[in-house]
Amino acid sequence: MAVYGSFRMNDAHACDEARGWYGRSQQKTERLDLLLGSPVPSGVHGADWAFSWRWNYAKTEVRERFLGLFDETLTRYDFDGLELDFSRASPFFRPGEIIENIPTLTQFMRDSQEIVKRHSASKDRELQLIVRVPVGIGENLEAGMDTETWIREGLADILVLGSPGYCVHEIDIGKAVSFAKENGTLVFTGFDGATYTVSPQEGYERSPSSVLRATALNGYRDGAAGVHLFNYDYPSHRAGPTDSNDFNIFDDYHLQTVQDLRETSSLEWRNRCYYLPSPTGAGRADHRLQVPRKLALMGRGAGPEHAMRLIVHDAIDGGKAEGRIGKTELRLRMEDFEDSLDRIHFEVNGKVLPFTPSRTVTNSQGQQWLVFDNPPLQQGLNTILLLLEGIETPDPWPSVHQCEILVLTSDLT
């Protein structure tokens, strides 16, 4: 087993003034000029106090500090390489200074790779550089991380596209793999062991492994060479509630999850849940959020482009024919829709369906999902359209908060 020294390139936890148990380093408290400081974009950790305790990578001293740590770590310890975790977390530059510093961060990556290469030569064995970045290549560039250039220049041996928050659905694996064709950089799909709110499945109400399986299979089918599983050592970041809060205890279900994530042949025979994340609260780090949303009015021009989009890289009909897939479900969690039932327009992949669920599923918090059995799903992109007919403004206004596609190979309990 290879062992890597891992560095969190910017940490959000220290930005919370109320998090007294989470310490701040002497370097930060003595050198506030090296931090992002003020102002802080809305929705970012530290915004409540208008001050960010993250490092400002526009500062030469900050970059040199990390490069020195990389060098010292490989000098003092016999690691197999380094992991630089940029998913935890942007921002890395002050507002208005991001674009001009894109080359700065790219040069920092070149310098980091040079350190790893130098230690590989001195130790006469290959050391690897792993780089973890958020899941959206375009969004990464907006944050100062030119992921495309990093891949095309081969600045990392393994490039992980991993969600900064919990497990998400949409990851730019296909794009990254296309950039890596000429240099052999391995692209991994990555996600946290925890998920956002999802319907009860397999006896669990929190973070069921079915979501991880779906995300992993999509990644493999897009060309990923492997899976990077983050935070799974935390019991609170596994399907739960867990039998024990001991970090060192994994029951059979969670061990099986780790084994399943290794290869497509296991994943395609296991239950999977393809879901749209619905983060709540401040400080959320994930992009491309499609829910929650209110239902738009057809009388005001709403149409097919309002559809929610989920990708399912599996041959649904073929899987059913070979007995691998038993059934499929569409699950929706909605609010304030009861008074507008006669106005709801419902389509799946362009086919108009009656808005009559087969049943409901409810968790211990009283949240309820409407279940539609065997909707007309397809391999690849699936669209789910929910609109209100007419032009009249509803009161209350119906909204959808969660959307899930379940591909089931065995009965859920």
Give the residues covered by each predicted segment.
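Extended extracellular/luminal ectodomain segments enriched in beta-structured repeat modules
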Residues: 318-331
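Extracytoplasmic/secreted cell-surface and envelope-processing proteins
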Residues: 13-17, 91-94, 139-141, 168-175, ...
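Substrate-binding cleft of secreted/luminal carbohydrate-active enzymes
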Residues: 158-168, 204-283
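Beta-strand-rich ligand-recognition modules
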Residues: 334-412
